[in-house]
Every structure is written in structure tokens, then in C-alpha cells.
Amino acid sequence: MSDILTRIEAYKREEIAAAKRARPIAELEVAAKTASPPRGFVAAIRRKLAEGDYALIAEIKKASPSKGLIRVDFDPPALAQAYQAGGAACLSVLTDTPSFQGHLDFMVAAREAVALPVLRKDFVYDTYQVVEARAHGADCILIIMAALDDATAKDIEDAAIDLGMDVLIEIHNHDELERALKLRSPMIGVNNRNLRTFDVTLATSEALAPLIPSERLMVGESGIFAPADLARLERVGIATFLVGESLMRQSDVTAATRALLARDAALRPTGTV
């Protein structure tokens, strides 16, 4: 398979250049300052964990490059409400259009429908996108270490923190973990999907989780479809999960979310994050 990440970067940089021409960053900065205040993405996750529950970042995703169209009856506000009713801690909304059929308007609509904090799920290459995310109400942004050099990752993180946002730092291998640990944000997501091939295995999280310092907040991403997958990752200390496709394919999203999160709390190992 071709290098998907390289293709995505090429069109994202064109998008960013066009967006800067259409709406100067000074204009976005004004909108960011007057936007609804950040809701505390990491804080919401920590509250769930403190209650002894799994913390779910539930994803609103219409399509993907590897699977094509995932959900036909795509209604972001209704899906957000279904996730909230099902016990999600936070939301993730795809805003990339060419590969995921997402849009910033979907994130805005989803956030307005619930009280949950929302992650703008996109490929971020420029601080302009961070300001753009906050101007549209995002509470958290994504830094993909595979897509950025260290200096750019730091600039993007600094911009997000300055705006009061949280950051999900995504890694896929040991080298990316070492680089991620140089950043300040506590939340590190282990993506079980290789973004250059789109191959998926939970063994990625199992290999990397023991190397992540205990003070960091670990998030398992991709390849999570059933309670057994959550239990498998919990055995290596991961109790926060980002799940999209498996829930997006269900007719009753609330029931599916509850079923995914259901388990005997007494069986949960102590001290997991």
C-alpha cells in the first residue's frame, strides 16, 4: 500500500495555505478568544478513571481511507448525544474532508449538542490549525508524532496550551514515544494502526505501554471492538480508549457504547490509568 500519510500531508498543506488566504490568523485569534471556554478534556478523563470506570473517547467518523463509508445515517449531534448517554467521557470528531468525509461544522454541531469535551481529530501541521480549532470550540487537538518534527510538534503544543486546550500526543513506535516524552502534555495515545500502511494490531499498545511513565495518561487507539479488547489493554495499564468505527457501525449507538464499557469493576486491577 502507498504511504498514506505522505499523501495526506500534501493535501493538508494545500488546505492550510488556502485557509490562511481565506481567513487570516488575526481574524481567527479574535474568534478563539470569544469562543466557548475549553471544557477540560484531560480533566473529564481523569474524573471517569477516579470513579473506577473506563474512560472512553468516543469518535464521530463518517468514513476512513481504509474502510470507505462507515455510517450512512450520519448525524453528528444525534451521535454525540448517543455517546454521552452511553457513558463516554469525551468526544473525538473527524474534521478532515478528503480522507474521512469530516468537517469542522460536524465538530461544532456535535459539541453544541452535549456537555462533553471535544477533540478536533485531524492532521495538524501548522499552528494556524490550532487557532482554527479553538475558534470553532475544540477543547483538545491531536499531535501525530509520525507526521511532525520535534520543533513543529512543540510549536503546536505551545499554541494549544496557550489557548487553554489539551493535547493528545499520538505515537506508534518507540522512537515516537521518546520524542513525545519531550513534550509537556500528559496524554499519550498509542495508535495500534500504522498510519503509513493502516495495518492494525493491539500488540503495539502491549509493547509500548510498559515504557510510558506512570504519570502520563495512556490512551489506546484503533483496533478496539469489544470488551475483551479493553480488558486486554487494561492488563498493560491502559484504561482510556479512543473508539470510533466499531461504534459507528451500530444501529443503537447508546446501547453499543454501554455494552463496550460494561464490566465488573471488582475485576479491574488497581492503579491503572
From Swiss-Prot:
Short name of any one Pfam family annotated for the protein: IGPS
GO biological process: L-tryptophan biosynthetic process
Signal peptide coordinates: none
Alphabetical list of InterPro entries matching this protein: Aldolase_TIM, Indole-3-glycerol_P_synth, Indole-3-glycerol_P_synth_dom, Indole-3-GlycerolPSynthase_CS, RibuloseP-bd_barrel
Catalysed reactions, semicolon-separated: 1-(2-carboxyphenylamino)-1-deoxy-D-ribulose 5-phosphate + H(+) = (1S,2R)-1-C-(indol-3-yl)glycerol 3-phosphate + CO2 + H2O
Domain of life: Bacteria
Aminoacyl-tRNA synthetase keyword on record: no
EC number: 4.1.1.48
Record GO terms (molecular function): indole-3-glycerol-phosphate synthase activity; phosphoribosylanthranilate isomerase activity
Pathway listed: Amino-acid biosynthesis; L-tryptophan biosynthesis; L-tryptophan from chorismate: step 4/5
Keywords: Amino-acid biosynthesis, Aromatic amino acid biosynthesis, Decarboxylase, Lyase, Tryptophan biosynthesis
UniProt entry tagged with the keyword Nucleotide-binding: no
NCBIfam families cross-referenced by the UniProt entry: PRK00278.1-2, PRK00278.1-6, PRK00278.2-4
Family: Belongs to the TrpC family.
Protein name: Indole-3-glycerol phosphate synthase
Originating species: Rhodopseudomonas palustris (strain BisA53)
Lineage: Bacteria, Pseudomonadati, Pseudomonadota, Alphaproteobacteria, Hyphomicrobiales
